Amino acid sequence: MKKELLKILREKKPLVHHITNVVTVNDCANITLAIGALPVMAHALEEVEEMVSAADALVLNIGTLTNEQVEAMIKAGKAANRFKVPVILDPVGAGATKLRTQSSKKILEEVKISVIKGNSAEISILAGKGGKIRGVESQGGVDDIAEAAKDLANAYNVVVAMSGATDIITDGKRIAYVKNGHPMMGTITGTGCMLTSVVASFCGVCEDYFETTIEAFVAFGIAGERAAQSSNVKGPGSFKVTFFDEIYNLTPEIIEKDKKVEV
């Protein structure tokens, strides 16, 4: 991994355009700021093209989707492709309903995505391998989830990042396993959405999206580990606050020392 990615990110302060869900929008904005990037939340059909033209990365998160929002996502995504802005798709709950599955596939067909970030069930559904979803949380997936991730990466020429106890990141050829993180991260809503924002922040400063996605997952996981070990943490509420602080206080040296990656 490139050791100075976090330093570059904080020097450049990439603008990350989000079209995201109403549940976690504030957390996504704040985590983007904490890692060192600049968030903008703009979803109106009339302005998304103009906004993405000024951005360094685009997040498309279907957590609370509507048909109008999907239209705005596709419009923004096509503009991002024209302006060579990386597009990060978070297909929240793909497989839970037909609308979510079909919308995710429609975006993938009409927009050149740079990174797809999801859990094992979401990724396996989009790879055509089956999977089981309850609500928007993964309840399981295919036996060989790494192969499902590689198949999806090759199908759309995209980096696939699958979050789990061990995160799997692949571009269809290379594959990395990230083992940073802590179970406390699952006790608060929105960690997946926030991770997507961090991925986009890193992708906004380097075009090797495989490497930048690994760096984002490692940084995010390390912050979770450090927050969980803090004496200030008494439960999910204090964990969340401390987690933001740990994201903010990350350094390239901390990432290099604490990373747990197999490539």
UniProtKB/Swiss-Prot annotation:
The keyword Cytoplasm does not apply. Its EC number is 2.7.1.50. It is an enzyme of class 2 (transferase). ATP binds at residues 117, 163. Pathway: Cofactor biosynthesis; thiamine diphosphate biosynthesis; 4-methyl-5-(2-phosphoethyl)-thiazole from 5-(2-hydroxyethyl)-4-methylthiazole: step 1/1. Keywords: ATP-binding, Kinase, Magnesium, Metal-binding, Nucleotide-binding, Thiamine biosynthesis, Transferase. HAMAP family: Thz_kinase. Belongs to the Thz kinase family. This is Hydroxyethylthiazole kinase. It comes from Thermoanaerobacter sp. (strain X514). The gene is thiM.
